[in-house]
Amino acid sequence: MTINALLLSSSRVGDTPYLAHAIPFIKPLTTQAQKWIFIPYAGVSMSYDTYLASVVMGLAELNLDISGIHQHPDPCQAIKDADGILIGGGNTFHLLHELYRYNLINLIREKVAQGTPYVGWSAGANVSGASIKTTNDMPIIEPPSFDALKIVPFQLNPHYSNYRTPGHNGETRAQRLLEFTKVEPLTPVIAIAEGSALWRRDNTLVLLGENPAYLFCGEQQEMLIPIGSDLSHLLK
């Protein structure tokens, strides 16, 4: 089977409606997948039912059968029965903590490797990488490990922007990612701007969307990746 995974930087771009910009990206993954399971564990500041309702509404035009994993008595069985997997944004630490809590890490990894389509945005994209060490989120809870789903073998940083607010003296995002590359100089980080996504199809990886991404790896810092770039070499 072929890995088919879409890793979105965000659920919105600019002032567009929730998930509206992502519909054209998600649609090709739904041609043979009707029954989807949504994992809302990153949504700490809202109820899981509220989160699910927003996703169902946002993706309504795709006519998918979407249920929340929290609605199922057996989360593992829900993953096994699903045609596709959706993981939303929020707090990456809480998301990963719950994936470990319910023993879903290896199961999701295996399902995706067997061809089950995967769509993740923001935190849902973060956990698709090798680890969550390059998330933007506050560590509000400690997962058993930072190791993540490893759908792609590198690091991700969604919502990327290196804007510095005038008068603000904190580190920029690029400076934070430089810190990671000093500790792990051989591990690439792909920083994805809002409105863009990575699409992995088996051994191919391409950048989709309207904004470029950036590569951080060792001495390479904030190297521009144009839209449409073939990044398949990063899968090796």
Curated annotation (Swiss-Prot):
One Gene Ontology cellular component: cytoplasm
Please list every transmembrane segment annotated in the UniProt record, as residue ranges. none
Superkingdom assignment: Bacteria
Location of the active site? S122, D137, H159
Q: Subcellular location, in the record's words?
A: Cytoplasm
Q: Which UniProt keywords apply?
A: Cytoplasm, Dipeptidase, Hydrolase, Protease, Serine protease
Gene Ontology molecular-function annotations: dipeptidase activity; serine-type peptidase activity
Q: Which cysteines are joined by disulfide bonds?
A: none
Q: Which reaction does it catalyse?
A: Dipeptidase E catalyzes the hydrolysis of dipeptides Asp-|-Xaa. It does not act on peptides with N-terminal Glu, Asn or Gln, nor does it cleave isoaspartyl peptides
Which CDD domains does the record match to this protein? Answer: GAT1_Peptidase_E
Principal localisation: cytoplasm
| Matching Gene3D superfamilies | 3.40.50.880
> Pfam families given for it?
Peptidase_S51
- Annotated InterPro entries: Class_I_gatase-like (IPR029062), Peptidase_S51 (IPR005320), Peptidase_S51_dipeptidase-E (IPR023172)
One GO biological process term is: proteolysis
Q: What class of enzyme is it?
A: hydrolase
EC number(s) reported in the record: 3.4.13.21
Q: Which family does it belong to?
A: Belongs to the peptidase S51 family.
Which function does this protein serve? Hydrolyzes dipeptides containing N-terminal aspartate residues. May play a role in allowing the cell to use peptide aspartate to spare carbon otherwise required for the synthesis of the aspartate family of amino acids.
PANTHER family assigned: ALPHA-ASPARTYL DIPEPTIDASE, PROTEASE S51 ALPHA-ASPARTYL DIPEPTIDASE
Q: Which HAMAP family match?
A: Peptidase_E (MF_00510)
Name the NCBIfam families for this protein.
PRK05282.1
Protein's name according to its UniProt entry: Peptidase E
Query: Which species is listed as the source?
Result: Shewanella putrefaciens (strain CN-32 / ATCC BAA-453)
